[in-house]
């Protein structure tokens, strides 16, 4: 209700990234921003078939809004594209029929991976990661001075039994 009240009070747009809605690990129910009463014209929901079904690079998703002005602006941008991802569209269409059991198995696997990752990270001296409540990634605090350089070092120089780790600096995802 707090978000809805702020959106209403200041007449803001609420961009709601709901691509990981199947991956909420707290037991809390998923509540879409589209169900917030009184701000229907302010909500812009972002969804992605490619993320839901682990189809990295397919880039097929949706932007959903009841706001006609926003919809028209988005359509102008979309119509300027010269080549929609036809193969990606075909893959995404087939993915929609994925059995519910598969999604449950994927959910269980992500919970297991999350628990393993967080447990391992938090055992390293100087490293801390909160337990993510959703999705399948974490933002960990590491004892390094420069996250960009550390991530590059992991890819170019780190080796453990012939393997490495790919990380991304959180600065690329957040402004705070």
Question: Which residue ranges define each predicted feature?
Answer:
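PLP-dependent class I/II
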Residues: 1-176
